[in-house]
């Protein structure tokens, strides 16, 4: 999965997919009442990027729905996975459950079209703080109460705080999550980060008894760091330059080992070599 980083304006969806992304990451900011409000990152952000592009969250969801609904004039068949980077740092811990409820209602109405031929992309809810694990239960309970538990088949989870792997496993246990887990690791492209924890996550994924199904690394913008990530065995790389990742995947060393994921590839299944 080539994951276009910080796709917060509707116009950027086409831009990143046309550069080779089959997945996008979108920032979600919340208001004081835990309502998802804007797709907005703000300053500071990755080097070489504008940090200030934004939409109202519900408007973005409608644009995303158009891009991921077969038959729509804006449909992009390659776009199969969306990571919502939930900026819950602005919330009190006791608002996490409420944020999950409100997120579920927004997605149900504006993305899934109340279960009636909505967008088809798989969704990852990426949470920066382990203490905010109740967001997951708020989300899953609400979709079930609203009569659409089947949509949870399209939803996965990530804790993005680079916490110790054991602590992340514990948070999932508390949240009642037993699958659909992506594990992120990384840092802004302005800084360097080694692959120690990525390798640990990959080992957990491949052990057959860990909690991780997929591993992604961010933010990967250079050919050398792309090769390092692929060599470490990641399932996804998040990037500001999808075309760079595509170029590396076409190199002799990688083109028979890796291919771009399609809609038929289940993002919750651990890949067995």
Curated annotation (Swiss-Prot):
InterPro entries, per the entry: PLC-like_Pdiesterase_TIM-brl
Where is it expressed, tissue-wise?
Expressed by the venom gland.
**Compartment(s) of residence:** Secreted
Record note on cofactor: Binds 1 Mg(2+) ion per subunit.
GO CC annotations, alphabetized? extracellular region
Q: Which cofactors are required for activity? A: Mg(2+)
- Catalytic reaction(s) noted: an N-(acyl)-sphingosylphosphocholine = an N-(acyl)-sphingosyl-1,3-cyclic phosphate + choline; an N-(acyl)-sphingosylphosphoethanolamine = an N-(acyl)-sphingosyl-1,3-cyclic phosphate + ethanolamine; a 1-acyl-sn-glycero-3-phosphocholine = a 1-acyl-sn-glycero-2,3-cyclic phosphate + choline; a 1-acyl-sn-glycero-3-phosphoethanolamine = a 1-acyl-sn-glycero-2,3-cyclic phosphate + ethanolamine
Domain of life per record: Eukaryota
Disulfide linkage = 45-51, 47-190
So where does Mg(2+) get bound?
Answer: 25, 27, 85
| Catalytic residues as annotated in Swiss-Prot or TrEMBL | 5, 41 (nucleophile)
Establish whether keyword Ubl conjugation is in the entry: no
Q: What GO biological process term is on the record, naming one?
A: killing of cells of another organism
| Major localisation | secreted
What keywords tag this UniProt record?
A: Cytolysis, Dermonecrotic toxin, Disulfide bond, Hemolysis, Lipid degradation, Lipid metabolism, Lyase, Magnesium, Metal-binding, Secreted, Toxin
- Enzyme class, one word? lyase
Q: Under which EC number(s) is this enzyme classified?
A: 4.6.1.-
Any Pfam family:
GDPD_2
SUPFAM superfamilies in the record:
PLC-like phosphodiesterases
State the Gene Ontology terms under molecular function: lyase activity; metal ion binding; phosphoric diester hydrolase activity; toxin activity
Family of this protein: Belongs to the arthropod phospholipase D family. Class II subfamily.
So what does this one do?
Dermonecrotic toxins cleave the phosphodiester linkage between the phosphate and headgroup of certain phospholipids (sphingolipid and lysolipid substrates), forming an alcohol (often choline) and a cyclic phosphate. This toxin acts on sphingomyelin (SM). It may also act on ceramide phosphoethanolamine (CPE), lysophosphatidylcholine (LPC) and lysophosphatidylethanolamine (LPE), but not on lysophosphatidylserine (LPS), and lysophosphatidylglycerol (LPG). It acts by transphosphatidylation, releasing exclusively cyclic phosphate products as second products.
Listed name of the protein: Dermonecrotic toxin LspaSicTox-alphaIA2ii
- Kindly list the organism's lineage: Eukaryota, Metazoa, Ecdysozoa, Arthropoda, Chelicerata
């Amino acid at each position: 999965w080539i994951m276009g980083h910080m796709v917060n304006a509707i116009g950027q969806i086409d831009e990143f997919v046309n550069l080779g992304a089959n997945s996008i990451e979108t920032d979600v900011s919340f208001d004081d009442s835990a309502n998802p409000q804007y797709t907005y990152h703000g300053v500071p952000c990755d080097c070489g990027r504008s940090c200030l592009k934004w939409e109202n969250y519900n408007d973005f969801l409608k644009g995303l729905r158009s891009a991921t609904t077969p038959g729509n004039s804006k449909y992009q068949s390659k776009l199969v996975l969306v990571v919502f980077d939930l900026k819950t740092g602005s919330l009190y811990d006791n608002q996490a459950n409420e944020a999950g409820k409100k997120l579920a209602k927004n997605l149900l109405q504006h993305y899934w079209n109340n279960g009636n031929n909505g967008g088809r992309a798989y969704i990852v809810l990426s949470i920066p703080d382990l203490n905010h694990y109740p967001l997951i239960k708020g989300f899953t309970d609400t979709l079930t109460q609203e009569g659409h538990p089947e949509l949870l088949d399209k939803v996965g989870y990530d804790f993005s705080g680079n916490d110790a792997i054991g602590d992340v496993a514990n948070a999932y246990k508390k949240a009642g999550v037993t699958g659909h887990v992506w594990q992120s690791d990384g840092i802004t492209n302005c800084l360097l980060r080694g692959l120690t924890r990525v390798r640990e996550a990959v080992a957990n994924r491949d052990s057959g008894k860990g909690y991780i199904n997929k591993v992604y690394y961010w933010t990967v913008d250079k050919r050398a760091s792309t090769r390092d990530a692929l060599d470490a065995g990641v399932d996804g790389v998040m990037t500001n330059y999808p075309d760079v990742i595509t170029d590396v995947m076409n190199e002799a060393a990688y083109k028979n080992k890796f291919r771009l994921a399609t809609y038929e590839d289940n993002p919750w299944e651990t890949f067995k070599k």
